[in-house]
Amino acid sequence: MPDKLIEIMAHKRREIAPLIRPVTETELAQLDASRPKPPSFADALRRPDGTLAVISEIKRRSPSAGEIKAGASAVEQARRYRAAGADALSILTDTEFFGGTLADLSDVTTEFRDQRPAPPCLRKDFMVHPVQVAQAREAGASAILIIVRALDDAEIQALYSAAQAAGLDALFEVHHETELERALHHRARIIGVNNRDLAVFKTDLALSERLIPQFPRDVIAVSESGIFTGADARRVHAVGAHAVLVGEALMKAPDPAALIAEFRAR
């Protein structure tokens, strides 16, 4: 079976090629200073009561699930999630494979701009260049995604340095011990285990059960993909996950609040 992540990354590199330009840390720091400070993504993932934080994802479709909620309004979905008690939002901005747009992110952060506390928003995309970090900050994101397997170490460092200069957190995504080692080499503060193998898009919660216990205690642990029930959430919480990132199950849920409560139940 062809490696889907290779296909996606090749498309993403072609897509952003016309936008690539030098982006300095000074420029990003000035951008950060000129914009309202976004809420902290990292802080939202450690709940004071010790229950799982829930990152609720806005995702219209995916290569694994196909159409999930075609034509869904990002703002309306974000309102539903916020009312349901989501701790943070993940907003797909990839159009080709996931049906999202950068405007979705901007629209959602604008919607909550005057609320206190506003939900922190992750720009969920296939990041390859600091210009995408600048876009994320301009759109009001609190964090970006860094997929370790998809990038070389120089690209990871460039993205992470850009995120820090722009005042953004970074969620490092890993799927294997070697990727975890690389994330830790870059001093990642937030690491997510993607239970879905992005090569073939199959999920296995045993990945979180294997990798999260290897995280240093000061790293925020996130379990991503394959979380559909309270039992799933309890499995990953039991091995040290601070948060779960859930898309498909919440997009389809008739009552997101009930499902989020189920995820948090001990």
From Swiss-Prot:
It catalyses: 1-(2-carboxyphenylamino)-1-deoxy-D-ribulose 5-phosphate + H(+) = (1S,2R)-1-C-(indol-3-yl)glycerol 3-phosphate + CO2 + H2O. This is Indole-3-glycerol phosphate synthase. The keyword Ribosomal protein does not apply. Signal peptide: none annotated. Belongs to the TrpC family. Pathway: Amino-acid biosynthesis; L-tryptophan biosynthesis; L-tryptophan from chorismate: step 4/5. Keywords: Amino-acid biosynthesis, Aromatic amino acid biosynthesis, Decarboxylase, Lyase, Tryptophan biosynthesis. InterPro entries: Aldolase_TIM, Indole-3-glycerol_P_synth, Indole-3-glycerol_P_synth_dom, Indole-3-GlycerolPSynthase_CS, RibuloseP-bd_barrel. The lineage of its organism: Bacteria, Pseudomonadati, Verrucomicrobiota, Opitutia, Opitutales. HAMAP family: IGPS_B (MF_00134_B). It is an enzyme of class 4 (lyase). GO terms for biological process: L-tryptophan biosynthetic process. It comes from Opitutus terrae (strain DSM 11246 / JCM 15787 / PB90-1). Its EC number is 4.1.1.48. One of its GO terms (molecular function) is indole-3-glycerol-phosphate synthase activity. It comes from the Bacteria.
